[in-house]
Design a protein with these regions (language model features):
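Alpha-helical transmembrane segments of multi-pass membrane proteins
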Residues: 1-198
Length: 198
């Protein structure tokens, strides 16, 4: 209801600038309702995931819900030219960082369970939203989201490679940490090659 209220207030605020409550205009009320609705949506998704999804799948299920949510918000922001909702779509990477921190344990495999679906879908949604929402977003926010997404991608790939090397190596062997060196090195080689990356 708060998200719909934010949308209606935003549309009304474009026509009627003088209306509002106290010192808050319709645009500010729309921003507050948008944040309120997004907060409730996130809390509800978290509670229902904890309630219904088995323990080992929770983080990946939350990533799928977050990617689907941002994809739908992206479409709505594009259709309505809604800058605030487009800015809210950039919260996908911080949410993914929280999910990664929540799932962190020594034997965590990012592409295990449903991670093979959740992480690529999340990165595809992130890149698509960065590309499609670029005209609606401030350049600084777009740049920060791009850098955070790049670091998250490198971290997830390094974690997966570390897990695979840990399966091959014996305990107390340095090979298990090779993933942390190979992925950033490969990224630096790609960047140094002069190709334009997404």
């Amino acid at each position: 209801a708060a998200l719909v209220g934010a949308w209606r207030l935003r549309r009304a605020g474009e026509r009627e600038r003088a209306l509002g409550i106290g010192t808050l205009g319709l645009a500010e009320l729309s921003h507050l309702l948008l944040l309120w609705g997004a907060g409730w949506w996130a809390l509800t998704a978290l509670c229902e995931t904890v309630r219904f999804v088995p323990y080992g799948l929770r983080e990946h299920a939350l990533l799928l819900v977050a990617a689907a949510t941002v994809a739908s918000w992206m479409l709505l922001a594009l259709r309505e030219r809604w800058r605030e909702l487009a800015l809210l779509c950039l919260a996908l990477v911080p949410v993914a960082l929280l999910a990664l921190a929540s799932a962190w344990r020594f034997d965590y495999q990012p592409f295990g369970e449903f991670g093979w679906l959740a992480w690529p879908l999340l990165f595809a949604t992130h890149l698509l939203s960065l590309r499609r929402l670029a005209p609606l977003l401030p350049a600084k926010a777009l740049s920060v989201a791009h850098v955070l997404g790049c670091w998250l991608l490198l971290g997830v790939l390094a974690l997966e490679l570390r897990y695979l090397f840990a399966l091959l190596a014996e305990q107390y062997n340095a090979w298990r940490w090779l993933g942390w060196a190979l992925v950033p090195s490969a990224y630096l080689l790609l960047v140094a090659g002069g190709r334009s990356l997404p």
